[in-house]
Regions:
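ATP-dependent carboxylate activation and anion-phosphoryl transfer catalytic cores
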Residues: 1-193
Length: 193
């Protein structure tokens, strides 16, 4: 209300979970738009944020949408961004080009794929390398269970004709440090080789 903004937006925080059980939150940024990661919030709250944003823009209120109370989070969700790029053993990220000859995303209970790939697609390296987002939902609030489900979904994603970061993502999702949340913001840099 103080800034006169009446729509959906994104507030980002970094959480530092210390060994003594305390958590420290650091504010990163606020965006007057949805971020690409909004799908995780949709899965754990059951609220279609894009539809809600459109309805608010058309003049509806949160009361009209039945959203006067903060939705209860349920379960656990993870999103994996499938990029048309490879990650070298030294951590260098390289763009991938070529004609997409096969695009067969995973599906099933608790698996959602948002993407735009199709056989015959010729991507340009002049734009963002994002090809798809695989979002998995676990009804149980278990990070490890959701991680394993995400890894399984990525193992079923069939993409041919260009390289993606799926092998890297699968490696991260299977890593014990990752599964036990024993990571920091430097973890990928320190473990890429």
């Amino acid at each position: 209300k103080a800034v006169g903004y009446f729509s959906l937006g994104t507030f980002e925080f970094l959480v530092d979970s210390r060994s003594d059980g305390q958590e420290k939150f650091a504010f990163i940024e606020a965006n007057a738009r949805l971020q690409v990661e909004h799908t995780v919030t949709e899965e754990v709250t059951g609220v279609d944020l894009v539809q809600s944003q459109i309805e608010i823009a058309s003049g509806k209120t949160l009361k009209d949408l039945g959203l006067t109370e903060t939705p209860n989070a349920r379960g656990f969700a993870i999103q994996a961004r499938i990029n048309m790029e490879t990650i070298e053993s030294d951590g260098t990220v390289r763009p991938s080009t070529g004609e997409l000859t096969t695009y067969d995303p995973p599906s099933g209970p608790g698996v959602r794929t948002d993407g735009f790939g199709y056989a015959g697609f010729l991507p340009s390296t002049n734009y963002d390398s994002l090809l798809a987002k695989v979002i998995v939902y676990s009804a149980r609030p278990s990070f490890e269970e959701a991680s394993k489900k995400c890894e399984r979904a990525l193992s079923e994603f069939r993409i041919e004709g260009l390289a993606t970061n799926i092998p890297f993502l699968r490696s991260v999702l299977k890593n014990n440090d990752f599964l036990t949340s024993n990571v920091t913001t430097r973890w990928v840099d320190e473990n890429a080789a």
